Amino acid sequence: IIKGTAVTTKFSLVGDDVHGSSGHVSYSTWIANATITVKSGSKASDVIVKAFKQYGYSIIGSTSYISGVTTPSGVSLKAFDNGSGSGWMYAVNGKSPNVGISGYKVSKDDNIILYYVDDWSNAKVPTVEDPADNQKAADAVIKKISEIGEVTESSENLIKEARASYDALTD
């Protein structure tokens, strides 16, 4: 329970496999758009600490410099594991703040992402898809398919709509 004014944020954690300086395939979302509520005046690091506690992750290093993350299953991903430019970065609302993680004061509805990069000099803030949005899109496709009913010449447009919706899921 939070006393005083509360600030609700979203938090995502995007990690990687340990693969050294070569062999990167893709990043993976470890925590997607978790709702984290902290007291007013809290820092981005406070949001991360609370999310990690809630989801069973732990920080390696300090809250002012996160040098690594350990997953609930005990796997650690640390700075320099995937090359000399690899490590953890953070973004708020799609942008990298010009202040350290323990210096950024969170605001209502901030979207905070802690993400691993293989090369900080060429880093891009990842987009985190909400699994609920994916399910809504899939449900919409299923509904369109079920609306087709018996396949006849007159159902051609319904089939085209369902196909277009399905194709949009795989983009």
What name fits each language-model region?
Residues 1-133:
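Ubiquitin-like/PB1-type beta-grasp interaction modules and other compact soluble beta-rich domains
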